Amino acid sequence: AYIDSVVLDGVNLGAIDSFRIAHIDADHTVEVIFAQYEYTISSFTNGHVTVAPVLGDTTVVYGSNVNYTFTVDDCYAITDVIVNGESVGVVANYSFTNVTDNQTIEVVTEVVTYTITATVNDEAAGNITPAGATTVVCDGTQSYNIAAANGYYISDVLVNGNSVGAV
């Protein structure tokens, strides 16, 4: 806490830490008004995440404890949380304890991706396009063209090891 102001007989003397009343010949009132230091916690994101208690600036008083929680949108993941310029890793919440200075917290997200690996059991018998590993964003769509070589036919297609028939 700090001295916000000193009031002597209804007159604000300002934020002083000492004064003297000389030649006292009447009653006096002295009021000292204290205030708590205030600090700002600034939170930022690159999007696709809800930050609680609030995204942006939060004012807290000296010694406060403040818990932040992060809830990502569907198909997004937290890739880092940065507090005062230092990574604290991939966390779903962070607590500031005994706040005595301004603070920053940033939540970094990215879209979730998946890898689809497409192969054929015998390359001489036909092909699948695109072949190999393909990266697809969450909730995305990937189409494949399957063609049998001359003299062959498609007997079965497996997706994650499960038959979907001769498509």
Residues covered by each model-derived region:
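First exposed extracellular module after export/assembly in secreted or surface-exposed proteins
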Residues: 5, 25, 53, 97, ...
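Conserved "repeat-terminator" motif of extracellular CCP/Sushi domains
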Residues: 17-40, 92-120, 167
